[in-house]
Curated annotation (Swiss-Prot):
GO CC list: plasma membrane
Lipid bilayer topology: Multi-pass membrane protein
Family under the similarity heading: Belongs to the complex I subunit 1 family.
Pfam families according to UniProt: NADHdh
Oligomeric and partner information: NDH-1 is composed of 14 different subunits. Subunits NuoA, H, J, K, L, M, N constitute the membrane sector of the complex.
GO terms (BP aspect): aerobic respiration
Name under which the protein is recorded: NADH-quinone oxidoreductase subunit H 2
Keyword terms, alphabetized: Cell inner membrane, Cell membrane, Membrane, NAD, Quinone, Translocase, Transmembrane, Transmembrane helix, Ubiquinone
Length: 340
């Protein structure tokens, strides 16, 4: 029996997986370049300025110049710092958001020259659990970065981050339980397929609100950027970082913004399922994600920063009760709908 066709199939399948992983890593690493340009442009126009204009047409090459500047800066390590943890922290902050995208589907399949290619790396039946388990590791990078620097500002920033992420990951996790109950699955593909006719935002507006606000806090974006508040902490947990290590933290922040936007689209807005206007599913998905990324940027230049006590109160006194009430109401309604 000739086994070569089977071996060739395995080689092609393995090569395709390697290509997908390499493409995903390249996109996520380069993502901050256009996003920083977009953020500065949006800020400029909201403040009746032009934004970056010097480097390239309308400042398009400004992110490249900023990247070169970061790469050529001195990689400074404070004399009293814990050198091992100081070097490890940026990697721990950057790696988890990248790993999470292994479980993120961007569509069903596309046909390339007669070959069906899936737009996901893995269809996990517990994908949601995997996402929350891995993203929780990111907090260790922030804590180690603040502690290892041996700086008061950095330590305070890392402690704030730890408290903030614990306070908001709980309601964030509770917010998706209603979605899981509707789809009867923790697979992100199954959740999108369950929204073919009606998006979950119709059934889960409270869950969406809780997840969106908690996502803002998880991404440490204004109005929840207490961990790196410039006014009272310098730059927070990465005050002592410079050069490529500082760039790691910046890339991590933008990747988390993208991740939260992708999860919002998949969980509540039908993923790649469109309405009214016929468009390719992948284009629908990208447009929805782009809308939420823009919303994150818009919030930064619209809302003031909350005080620390207000931040904690919103998480424990508002979002947590809302998310628990949403679970109870969803369960009651599903039970009533299933009753004869």
């Amino acid at each position: 029996m000739n086994k070569w066709p089977r071996i060739m199939e395995l080689i092609v399948a393995f090569g395709l997986i390697v290509f997908k992983v390499a493409l995903l890593i390249a996109i996520l690493l380069l993502l901050p370049l256009p996003l920083t340009w977009l953020e500065r442009k949006i800020a400029g126009h909201m403040q009746q300025r032009m934004g970056p204009m010097r480097v390239g047409w309308h400042g398009l090459l400004q992110p490249v110049a900023d990247g070169i500047k970061l790469l050529t800066k001195e990689d400074h390590i404070p004399a009293e710092a814990d050198r091992f943890l100081f070097k490890l922290a940026p990697i721990l902050a950057l790696a988890p958001p990248f790993v999470v995208f292994v479980a993120i589907p961007f569509g069903e399949t596309i046909s390339v020259r007669g070959t069906e290619i899936t737009l996901y790396l893995s269809n996990m039946n517990v994908a949601l659990l995997f996402v929350f388990a891995v993203i929780g590791i990111e907090v260790f990078g922030v804590i180690f970065g603040g502690w290892a620097a041996n700086s008061k500002y950095a330590v305070l920033g890392s402690l704030r981050t730890c408290a903030q992420m614990i306070s908001y990951e709980i309601p964030m996790g509770f917010a998706v339980i209603g979605v899981v109950m509707l789809a009867q699955s923790m697979s992100l593909l199954d959740i999108v397929r369950a929204q073919t006719d009606v998006w979950n935002i119709v059934y889960q507006p409270v869950g969406f609100f809780v997840f969106f606000v908690a996502g803002l806090a998880e991404a440490q974006r204004i109005p929840f950027d207490l961990a790196e508040a410039e006014g009272d902490l310098g730059a927070g947990f990465h005050t002592e970082y410079s050069g490529i290590r500082f760039a790691f933290f910046m890339v991590s922040e933008y990747v988390i913004v993208l991740l939260v936007s992708v999860l919002l689209v998949i969980l509540f807005f039908g993923g790649w399922n469109g309405i009214l206007v016929p468009m390719p599913p992948l284009l629908w998905f990208l447009l929805k994600v782009a809308f939420f990324v823009y919303l994150f940027i818009w919030f930064r230049f619209t809302f003031p920063r909350y005080r620390y006590d207000q931040l904690m109160a919103i998480g424990w006194k508002v979002l947590l009760p809302l998310s628990m009430a949403n679970i109870i109401i969803t369960g009651v309604l599903l039970g009533a709908a299933a009753a004869p």
